[in-house]
């Protein structure tokens, strides 16, 4: 499927489908919301009606659809957008209608393409525009994409065993990184046969590796802060998110503050801060003012991290790779949206039972309140990470990562790439 270019079908959050790299990212940014010219309730209802008709007409083809096989690229220069007064934007009413359409369209798609009957696979390769080291970076990307999954699977099991004994996890930043998060975890009714974390190697997401869960929202709170992260084609600077009861309460980024002249006044700073907040809401949260924390994960691919640091390309890597290079947090839906009732088992035979949270479980009462159609990962790189600590019910503290290095027994081999 070719990526849409018309305003009727264009996704403001980015391109979906096969497409070339953009010749003008500022142009794309300026025209994200051109549909604001005509977006009203009549249009929303008509678009939903056409969607239903199209799926009914092609239901045989939809039933045979197994899911996407995606090849991403990376290496373009990082992009920091400039807000233009002339660019269209949604009014509050249009934003509400847009979100309502997303909520109403998701059950339609799931009716014809059930989430528990499809999968996906995704991989990324560098472009020559990444610089003079392209050939070497390409070779190392191949190495990263073909790491020994059995070795990582065993190492990650040590992390999961520690996490399954936790009441909650504490994540702290290091240096200028102000992250201070408490992540509450789902309860296990039978620890002998159940686990909270999926042992993820390279079965769908390439490269490997991570362990991830759907956090319990109640009790999950604190500040997430990242100095720089590349999401949806935009480099976010000094990104922050505050969480309370597992839900985003405030966001900010320094993209527009950084661009101000040294003698900017307070009003200019206030406007730049608000522009940064809106950028996060539009590009990361897909117009939602608040979202739950849908995922907490610990990435273990220190080889990818070492490569990125060696070539100085961390801010040009896609989130597909970056999410494996430290702990990451996704806002929006869980990793199991629309397939929560399908059992999932780790290689050790334990069932991964933390497939729901307090929001997704609402699907049993009102599906429109359970999903957001959003899942955006935000990673803290190892160098900005102070510690990840398991806190057990009795108060015992067990370190998984300290000062950017794996210290949990059984995981020390992951530090070899960092030492090189």
Question: Where does each model-flagged region fall?
Answer:
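Tryptophan-anchored aromatic micro-motifs
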Residues: 223-225
């Amino acid at each position: 499927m070719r990526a849409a270019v018309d305003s009727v079908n264009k996704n403001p959050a980015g391109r979906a489908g096969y497409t070339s790299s953009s010749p003008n990212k500022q142009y794309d940014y300026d025209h994200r919301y051109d549909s604001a010219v005509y977006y009203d309730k009549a249009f929303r209802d008509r678009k939903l009606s056409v969607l239903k008709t199209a799926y009914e007409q092609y239901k045989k083809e939809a039933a045979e659809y197994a899911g996407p096989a995606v090849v991403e690229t990376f290496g373009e220069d990082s992009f920091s957008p400039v807000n233009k007064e002339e660019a269209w934007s949604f009014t509050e009413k249009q934003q509400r209608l847009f979100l309502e359409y997303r909520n109403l369209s998701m059950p339609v798609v799931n009716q014809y393409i059930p989430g528990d009957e499809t999968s996906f696979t995704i991989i990324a390769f560098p472009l020559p525009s990444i610089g003079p080291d392209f050939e070497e970076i390409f070779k190392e990307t191949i190495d990263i994409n073909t790491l020994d999954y059995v070795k990582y699977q065993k190492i990650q099991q040590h992390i999961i065993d520690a996490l399954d004994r936790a009441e909650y996890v504490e994540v702290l930043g290091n240096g200028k990184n102000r992250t201070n998060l408490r992540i509450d975890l789902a309860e296990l009714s039978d620890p002998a046969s159940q686990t909270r974390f999926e042992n993820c190697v390279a079965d769908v997401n390439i490269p490997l590796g991570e362990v991830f869960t759907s956090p319990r929202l109640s009790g999950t709170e604190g500040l997430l802060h990242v100095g720089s992260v590349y999401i949806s084609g935009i480099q976010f600077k000094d990104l922050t998110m505050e969480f309370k009861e597992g839900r985003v309460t405030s966001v900010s980024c320094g993209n527009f503050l950084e661009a101000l002249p040294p003698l900017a006044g307070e009003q200019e700073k206030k406007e730049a801060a608000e522009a940064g907040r809106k950028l996060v809401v539009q590009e990361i949260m897909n117009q939602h003012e608040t979202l739950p924390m849908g995922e907490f994960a610990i990435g273990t691919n220190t080889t990818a991290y070492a490569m990125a640091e060696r070539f100085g390309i961390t801010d040009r890597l896609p989130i597909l790779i970056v999410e494996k290079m430290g702990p990451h947090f996704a806002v929006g839906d869980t990793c199991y949206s629309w397939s929560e009732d399908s059992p999932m088992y780790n290689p050790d035979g334990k069932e991964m039972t933390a497939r729901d949270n307090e929001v997704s479980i609402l699907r049993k009462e009102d599906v429109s309140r359970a999903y957001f159609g959003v899942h955006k990962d935000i990673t803290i790189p190892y160098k900005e990470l102070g510690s990840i600590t398991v806190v057990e019910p009795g108060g015992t503290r067990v370190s998984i990562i300290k000062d950017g290095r794996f210290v949990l027994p059984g995981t020390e081999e992951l530090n070899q790439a960092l030492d090189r």
